[in-house]
């Protein structure tokens, strides 16, 4: 049965990748269909009730700078906000919010339902329609066929999903949801490499059975951070505390005693789990010398008693879960509301993707989220936005776009995946970026919003606010550079007590702000140096740009040098056997990874500078040297 309308872009899946993909495509004017197995779970936070963190918060800010929904929804749902690494430099500071699951889901659904050009339809997808190497539509569970020249798959953990609790297992996409078995079988027929990964979640605890007085309270920040560049602290709901407790030797003995019934340690689970979010049984086994592990006791919302004990993800049998929970301080009488579990699922080798997230073998088919081997809401949302945007660009006959590694963490994420692939769930860290001094949370809008506007992702309201902020920053920087103070000036009497050494020569206000002991609020508080900018985010940007200008210029020089050949394209039909001087090892690596640019090739493990030089000489001789857009 054929659906009565044709669409430009179809998005399959309504998680964090799917919602951002659908919204991006629709914002750009493409007639978009979002297909989900359950409209009520659109925007569902399947695992931990939190958004942001180190590296992840940077991605959220980038999604926001490109007009995405994640940060906006977090501001309306965040019940505790903290700035991590606040005592360190701005490059590694990160915003993290504890979120009310229901409020977050409702806000995402509200944004989806009010988005022009977007249709939502509830049906699971069982089949892709591919003709002559190009996707032309999908077929749902009930046999309903939808046509579109571009399809974005964001299936999360649903592809061949299998849930494990102890030695028992059953098919599922997540607890309470069916898996996508037919679609998984169909995708395995495609010429794309497939593997299995694993992730897990902890048991949920009833707050009424926890003694919080035995734990350490962890409050949010004051003043409260805001996640979105267009957000307001007044959007935040009621704020609550989290708590901290620890496992102990008794907990570890209980876990060790249950390992013979662990699906991980009995060989039942084949998939590889996330290195940076291991299960508690994995932590106890791998770090046998540690006598305790920290657990964050996180509320799941304002109107629920469910607690998420972050740090004890497990797939041990229920009786072992209950005993280990009750061995922890403050949880001696705890009751489990939902058992923890592990889930195995299919993922596809991201090296088979272009950096637009379109598959290399099937035109018009895009993958985003956990299907590409990543873990985390933020990584999924960022990929979803990029895939939805590029699907829309393709339908409009325009060239694909992906930020470079020096432009965005999103660029780092996609380049890592499409060049190197992954054999374990990939998560973002600031350490993955070579140019993190330039890729800060605070300047994500300065880096990306103008490009987002050009692409059609950024609406008039966001653009007006951004333009106003940019004007404020530029005007204030010009003022600081143009105002001078002389050692004999009347201003010096009020200024010198704030300086480590009195000024002995004429200096601009910018020179004074650059001093280590001075900051923008302090300088503006001194008579004659104000007025200060009212917009605190613009004021922060002024301070950072002045304080770090030397380091930023140095890093920009490094980028300019590296970028000279970064975007030099490698022809897709280039036969590396015909390139004189390449070793068999390099030829094998190039054929395996199929890099699109010299930059991607240079990051393949084992690739030598000599091999890159040989490639460049070959391209030049053949007249094939050209850059990507």
UniProtKB/Swiss-Prot annotation:
Record keywords, A-Z: Cytoplasm, FAD, Flavoprotein, NAD, tRNA processing
InterPro entries: FAD/NAD-bd_sf, GIDA_C_N, MnmG, MnmG-rel, MnmG-rel_CS, MnmG_C, MnmG_C_subdom, MnmG_C_subdom_sf
Function: NAD-binding protein involved in the addition of a carboxymethylaminomethyl (cmnm) group at the wobble position (U34) of certain tRNAs, forming tRNA-cmnm(5)s(2)U34.
The species this protein was found in: Shewanella pealeana (strain ATCC 700345 / ANG-SQ1)
Binding site residues for FAD: 13-18
Protein name: tRNA uridine 5-carboxymethylaminomethyl modification enzyme MnmG
GO molecular function per UniProt: flavin adenine dinucleotide binding
Ribosomal protein found in the keyword field: no
Binding sites annotated in the UniProt record for NAD(+): 273-287
GO biological process: tRNA methylation; tRNA wobble uridine modification
Superkingdom of this protein's organism: Bacteria
Main location: cytoplasm
UniProt-annotated location(s): Cytoplasm
Cofactor: FAD
GO cellular component, one term: cytosol
């Amino acid at each position: 049965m054929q659906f009565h309308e044709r669409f430009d872009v179809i998005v399959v899946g309504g998680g964090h990748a799917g919602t951002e993909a659908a919204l991006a495509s629709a914002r750009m004017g493409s007639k978009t269909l979002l297909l989900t197995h359950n409209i009520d779970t659109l925007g569902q936070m399947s695992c931990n009730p939190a958004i942001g963190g180190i590296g992840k918060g940077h991605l959220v800010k980038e999604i926001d700078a490109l007009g995405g929904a994640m940060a906006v929804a977090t501001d309306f749902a965040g019940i505790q906000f903290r700035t991590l690494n606040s005592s360190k430099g701005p490059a590694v500071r990160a915003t993290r919010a504890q979120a009310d699951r229901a409020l977050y889901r409702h806000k995402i659904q509200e944004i989806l339902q009010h988005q022009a050009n977007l249709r939502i339809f509830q049906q699971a997808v069982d089949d892709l329609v591919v003709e002559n190497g190009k996707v032309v539509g999908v077929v749902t569970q009930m046999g309903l066929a939808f046509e579109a020249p571009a399809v974005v798959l964001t299936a999360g953990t649903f592809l061949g999903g299998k849930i494990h609790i102890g030695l028992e297992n059953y098919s599922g996409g997540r607890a309470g949801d069916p898996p996508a078995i037919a679609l998984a079988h169909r995708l395995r027929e495609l010429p794309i490499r497939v593997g299995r990964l694993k992730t897990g979640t902890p048991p949920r605890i009833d707050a009424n059975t926890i003694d919080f007085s035995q734990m350490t309270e962890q409050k949010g920040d004051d003043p409260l951070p805001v996640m979105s560049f267009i957000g307001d602290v007044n959007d935040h709901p009621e704020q609550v505390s989290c708590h901290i407790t620890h496992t102990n030797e008794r907990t570890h003995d209980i876990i060790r005693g249950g390992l013979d019934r662990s699906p991980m340690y009995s060989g039942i689970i084949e998939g590889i789990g996330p290195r940076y979010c291991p299960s508690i049984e994995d932590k106890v086994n791998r770090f046998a010398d540690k006598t305790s592990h920290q657990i964050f006791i996180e509320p799941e919302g304002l109107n629920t008693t469910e607690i998420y004990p972050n740090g004890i993800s497990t797939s041990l049998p229920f009786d072992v879960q209950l005993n280990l929970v009750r061995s922890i301080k403050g949880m001696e009488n705890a009751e489990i509301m939902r058992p923890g579990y592990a889930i195995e699922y299919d993922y596809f080798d991201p090296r088979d993707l272009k950096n637009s997230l379109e598959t290399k073998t099937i035109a018009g088919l895009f993958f985003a989220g956990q299907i590409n081997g990543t873990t985390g809401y933020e990584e999924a949302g960022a990929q979803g936005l990029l895939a939805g945007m590029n699907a829309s660009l393709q339908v409009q006959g325009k060239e694909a776009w992906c930020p470079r590694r020096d432009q965005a963490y999103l660029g780092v994420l996609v380049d890592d995946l499409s060049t190197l692939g992954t054999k374990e769930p990939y998560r973002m860290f600031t350490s993955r970026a070579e140019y993190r001094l330039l890729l800060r949370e605070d300047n994500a809008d300065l880096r990306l919003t103008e490009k987002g506007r050009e692409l059609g992702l950024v609406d008039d309201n966001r653009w007006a606010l951004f333009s106003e902020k940019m004007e404020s920053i530029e005007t204030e920087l010009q003022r600081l550079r143009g105002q001078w103070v002389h050692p004999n000036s009347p201003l010096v009497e009020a200024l010198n007590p704030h300086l480590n050494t009195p000024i002995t020569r004429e200096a601009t206000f910018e020179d004074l702000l650059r001093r280590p002991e001075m900051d923008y609020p302090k300088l503006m508080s001194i008579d004659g140096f104000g007025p200060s900018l009212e917009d605190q985010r613009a004021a922060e940007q002024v301070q950072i740009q002045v304080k770090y200008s030397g380091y930023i210029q140095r890093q920009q020089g490094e980028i300019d040098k590296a970028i000279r050949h970064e975007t030099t394209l490698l022809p897709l039909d280039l036969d590396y056997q015909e390139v004189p001087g390449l070793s068999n090892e390099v030829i094998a690596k190039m054929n395996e990874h199929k890099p699109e640019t010299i930059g991607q090739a240079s990051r393949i493990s084992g690739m030598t500078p000599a091999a890159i030089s040989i490639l460049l000489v070959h391209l030049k001789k053949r007249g094939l040297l050209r850059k990507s857009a």
